[in-house]
Amino acid sequence: GGRFANLLGWDGWAAYKPYALLWVAVTAVVTFTLWSIVVRRRLALLAALATTLAGMLHGVDEPYAWPSAAWLAPVAVLAWQALRREEGTPRWTLACVGCYVGFAAITYTLHFGFAVLLVLVMAAVLGVFRVHSGRKVWPTVKQLFFRLLPIGLVSLAVALLVWTPYLVQTKLLLDSPKNAAMHYLPQEGATFPLPMTETNALGVLCMAGVVWLLLRFRRNEIAAALLVLVTAIYCWYVLSTLALVAKTTLLAFRLNVILDGALAAAGVFALLELIGFLRERIDARHALQVTTVALAVGLIGAVSMNQTAISEKLQPAKEQAYSDYYPTGDNAKGAKDPKEPGHWAPAVYAAVGQLTGKDPQENILLTTDYKLMSFKPYWGFQQETPHYANPLGEYDQRADEIKRWAAAKTPQQLLDMLNSSRFAPPNVFVLKHPDNASGQQSGQQGQSGDGGKLQLTLKGDAFPQSPNVRDYDVAFDPAVFQSPQFAQREVGPYTVIVRR
């Protein structure tokens, strides 16, 4: 996304919407291409359409994660066919599966881990069936190994394009730091997903898919592959539940969109087989009527899925989009409420620019009002939560450093702490008044008039509690900034402090 914005010369926040929509479109085209490899193009078009409708909101909300989710179902079918084939498998098939696994590794690590497990499970299932049918163990293992080897090599080559610096820094993961990313268990992750029980068009389509998978998996390769995929997702949920014993999860709910797409595609195949069955059993004079009814029902279902997604599931995001403030200090409705911190964003940006005399990308900010960071390319000293922090960023150590700075009693003591920090220290502090004095006018010089301390709100990992983060305040004595080494300005609820 960042490279897309750079290419267009846009700010990241402005490029997000077209970037997300572009990924949804590209993902749909590639999904169709992948399905067309394993089924006829007409079927592939319908399967890709069902997948897109089932997961479109995920694509808009998390465009970086949508491709690997949408493509997994057809890739799973390709992998199953490649592993199941008795004669030599075309190299391009193995390379295609490997490219997908590598792509998942550089875009969404959870999907990468699940895809690796899925391919290994498929190989194990096929190996067990072959040995059970009388094949010798060693030749079976050898054949499957040499099918898996190209997949692994290609995926490794693709993944290393992005992962090499991290692997070098962590000594091939032997020195990997603690990571809180897996410490999250929302309500949807605490229960098994049952999309086939929903009382809408997607629920009907998924139920048809479940029935088709159970009836056809013995005689249809596509049904067998998708059934293994669906079963693996539920097994991942079981493993994620067991992981709670170790006070972590496997973020199983992130696989729900894959489940929806796979069952929706299976539902398309089920309905098409049902239509074909009816056309063969009824009088030829009524065959056209059956096709017409099927097309009408399919169109109504597609429109229903689309409208449900836009009108219901997207409603909270739409409300937030209307209320969020732009970098101009107003929101989509034109509101300019001084009680809202976002109203003061332009004044904060102006204060930082005037006091530092530097471009945004030359400044390191210490603030926990992260919406200020959304519109300007400042460097941030601290990430918003430990769950989204780069493991190499040492979130906890940075939080301890901030608390150490807040304990300073004099300006010189604070300066000495900043100079001796093992991290690149911030040159800009954007702190909040304790009374959140949003009614003050920008441009006023000096410190907070009531002499109260200036605050930051930090977050810590609270898993397995819900919510999984805890907020705590860190307060700076305004006196530690009373030095010629600092310049400061009050802007609404903020005090902007710049180190000269």
Predicted feature locations:
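Membrane-embedded helix bundles of polyisoprenyl
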Residues: 20-127
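Transmembrane catalytic cores of multi-pass membrane glycosyltransferases
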Residues: 58-68, 93, 103-228
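Membrane-helix boundary/interfacial segments in multi-pass membrane proteins
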Residues: 9, 58-67, 108, 173-197, ...
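Membrane-interface junctions at the ends of membrane-embedded or membrane-associated helices
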Residues: 80-93, 125-143, 264-288
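Aromatic-anchored segments of alpha-helical transmembrane domains
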Residues: 51-56, 101-105, 155-162, 229-242, ...
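Short periplasmic/luminal acceptor-recognition loop of GT-C membrane glycosyltransferases, typified by
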Residues: 301-406, 418-472, 476, 480-499
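Signature aromatic-anchored transmembrane alpha helix within multi-pass, membrane-resident enzymes
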Residues: 156, 275-316
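Short hydrophobic/aromatic helix or loop-helix immediately within or flanking a transmembrane segment
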Residues: 1-12
